């Protein structure tokens, strides 16, 4: 009977966790958010699973379906080898979204229960253990991020296992639990595992037995699990590091001297979903703990204060990109442990059993109130009706049917409302469905540059890395988007076919040099790619290329409406309006008998930088995000390319509220033949569907002259190309894509991608497995030696406090 009672607190805590998940999130909608969860965390793991079913490869290297085709380690952050995601591979009948909601809740519950168990090992009273477990649960990021950016917190059970493993290491010199916890933490969330390992290190150093401080070999025994876990996970870490290090991006400039000035602002500790998110009392615990605690907890307080208040640690833990408190989320369990130690000390000093709980109660109430506010205002819970539409199996049926009909290699995308497109950027229904769309914090840099600087596709969202289905028909043709899947208001799904889309791989001898291409400005830098491919080795020269390109679009007069909110200032237009304006632009078409393409580009000068600017032209949306936005898109050049009906001179446009000026306005029209002309694609690649999957493309191509194979697959150094079994050096064509020379004749092509660092990572992981065996041997040796010393009359290595185990 007594043994059964010890499970009662765990059952109660499980129920309390369920209640607060419902209170903070479940009652507001799905246990998933429209921000990131719906567009990244629930769909990219599903793509991993689909590719595994297609290829049977547990160690994939390439993601052909996302962002034109990219190194799969660009997306490793989303759970490529996560121990929480891999079990879903055994459950093909369970939707990934459903699976993730269940796993997120169970992970959160396991974290709370493990925290309760961990504090029990240290002899804390049951009331203190229960109260601090609630504190841990109600910390800002715990529930909030369990349904938003789940990688912020889903490693917590393994972090707690590692902390428990530290205790076992100092008690028995056993390494396994500590090593396992660190390894699983890395595999679950390598980004947060760095800070997680710092937390484990701080806790372990503080618990280092005083009598052994001079035994260097004991310290090396302690850090051995860190090296073992890191080396074992090298098959993930090395190729991921190689993928991330080639990326370049803007980050806020940080002055070196400011990194070493302590910052004791309460916002670093108090309630937020993007930081530690505890109450202000935690700062008092850390400061008073220096005077009230014994050595180990005192050292923990000092080290925590140093790390949490010196900006240099935040900067380092955020990869040197910026200073943000989200990197400190792994400190939550350690700070809650110190809170338990503080309450226990108060209980001992004042001999009042319930005084600690009474002291903590106001802070818990505050966290509940703050949690209600932040989850309701910022949680952005996914709407059930939206999710039902996004997860409608009819999408898959339509896409599967279209793929079954396709003999060539083309792309296929979903098209819908702004919110639907945002949610579908990474959604793949069939691993043979290739797309141009992508929303990921890591990406192919050449492709990103092509989208945002070269072709200047529209940016409809707040950040510059969200690329949904483009409204630019030239871009869709260039990238081989042959089918757009739509759903009408009645829920009927249909396919819009673009017969003139470029094959993803084709051969041509119509080339223009990089030097010539770089001289072209808008819109000719777009129209040129409909007529020529850009390659440096241009063996065929032509003097009339530039003339043909310049004839592809002609300037056209554009007239803005006369409105009290729209003021003409020379060649510029100043828009100052308290509400959005729906109006039309007038243009003089050169022909009224057929459809035409309309090109428009201008610079936006925002007089109110903290207010976003959005302009929607003929259904295409461009946005300049507010300067305060954490991922400001810096989209000051708005580019629109759209189709106009025959004789259409009025173009619908919507100007958002704000105060801004449009300068450098360029407007052109081009013939529809830019879309319908396929003379550039002189020979189409015919894929072998059986072998074209995962990191491999195989098939045949015939060409009647010497030229180039041009692809719309972003270039990467990991590509290996062979023609008829002979290796060919791949080149960068069209400024950002894979290409290579081809001689005339009938050829068999093989394109294989090997992620840089993948092979080295696997070799180092084998070394890690050796270290596991070595660690086990060392732990057995040390444990037996300790036991023999104890039996022969010596004192044990470590004195355990009375009541240190769970009872």
Please tell me what each predicted stretch does.
Residues 66, 143-153, 250-275, 302-351, ...:
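Membrane-helix boundary/interfacial segments in multi-pass membrane proteins
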Residues 74, 366-381, 404-475, 502, ...:
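Extracytoplasmic/lumenal acceptor-recognition loop(s) of multi-pass membrane glycoenzymes
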